């Protein structure tokens, strides 16, 4: 057995020493064949483990958020759960959450593009939010245009096979807004990280805003939306509200616009948005493990 191949296989696949050694022995040092065998075994053993572990509590994990402004104003946020903080920090788990989030975004983009071709939205995409149910999420393909691509449920099983904990796909939502608006995002937690365009944390939020005065460039609008998303994570509002209705309650209000602004206590959120010339169109907040 080639020891250099063993080291490379362990590093690139994340599998243990004994599994990688077994793969290389069976494949007679054919690296590609050994890697393929490992992934087949991981999926097979993962489904077996998943069936055994499915009753175990999984309330830890990560929130993943991606916002894309390049071709359309589109954001996706998902929750993926595991049993322990230790696994939530594992590279394989983080990669899984990244894949689930980016797949959710691609799924929504594909629907919008198909509807645009059918002229269902005319020339403009109006503001939409869509909750994706767990069973729908499980049946999404990593490459949504490829019918032979792996299902997200199979990918979850593979990671269960590697990490040995119960892992569950949780909530998922997408927000789409028209070209004049911008979606901002924010994540928070004890180990916030980022992979490619995806940000991860224990808490996450997306906020869609629209300009109500001229002269606000897109980058400034995005910065304002990100600040408002930070407020949403920290203060947990339930509704947007009308603004000016309960200023005396300050931070006690559940209406976003009536809350004391997290980054400037001299203003309510409503006063801040009026001052900056923006209007909150929509927001959504996720907390990992929350009902």
From Swiss-Prot:
GO terms of molecular function: translation elongation factor activity
Cell compartment(s), UniProt: Mitochondrion
Keywords linked to the UniProt accession: Elongation factor, Mitochondrion, Protein biosynthesis
Pfam family, one: EF_TS
Main location: mitochondrion
Top-level taxon: Eukaryota
PANTHER family linked to this entry: ELONGATION FACTOR TS, ELONGATION FACTOR TS, MITOCHONDRIAL
Protein purpose: Associates with the EF-Tu.GDP complex and induces the exchange of GDP to GTP. It remains bound to the aminoacyl-tRNA.EF-Tu.GTP complex up to the GTP hydrolysis stage on the ribosome.
Note: This protein may be expected to contain an N-terminal transit peptide but none has been predicted.
Protein name, as recorded: Elongation factor Ts, mitochondrial
Organism: Nematostella vectensis
């Amino acid at each position: 057995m080639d020891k250099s191949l063993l080291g490379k296989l362990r590093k690139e696949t994340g599998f243990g020493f004994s599994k990688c050694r077994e793969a290389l022995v069976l494949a007679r040092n054919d690296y590609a064949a050994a890697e393929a065998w490992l992934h087949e075994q991981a999926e097979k053993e993962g489904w077996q483990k998943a069936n055994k572990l499915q009753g175990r509590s999984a309330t830890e994990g990560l929130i993943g958020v991606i916002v894309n402004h390049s071709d359309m104003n589109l954001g996706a946020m998902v929750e993926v759960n595991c049993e322990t903080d230790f696994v939530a920090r594992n590279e394989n788990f983080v990669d899984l959450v990244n894949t689930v989030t980016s797949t959710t975004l691609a799924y929504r983009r594909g629907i919008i593009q198909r509807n645009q071709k059918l002229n269902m939205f005319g020339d403009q995409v109006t503001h939409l939010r869509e909750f994706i149910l767990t069973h729908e999420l499980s049946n999404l393909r990593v490459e949504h245009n490829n019918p032979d691509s792996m299902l997200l449920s199979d990918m979850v099983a593979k990671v269960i096979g590697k990490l040995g904990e119960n892992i569950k796909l949780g909530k998922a939502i997408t927000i789409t807004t028209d070209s004049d608006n911008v979606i901002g995002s924010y994540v928070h937690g004890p180990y916030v990280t980022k992979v490619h365009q995806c940000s991860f944390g224990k808490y996450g939020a997306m906020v869609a805003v629209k300009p109500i005065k001229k002269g606000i460039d897109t980058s400034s609008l995005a910065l304002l939306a990100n600040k408002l998303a930070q407020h949403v994570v920290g203060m947990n509002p339930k509704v947007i509200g009308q603004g000016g209705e309960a200023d005396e309650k300050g931070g006690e209000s559940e209406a976003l616009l009536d809350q004391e602004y997290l980054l400037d206590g001299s203003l309510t959120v409503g006063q801040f948005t009026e001052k900056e010339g923006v209007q909150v169109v929509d927001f959504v907040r996720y907390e990992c493990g929350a009902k």
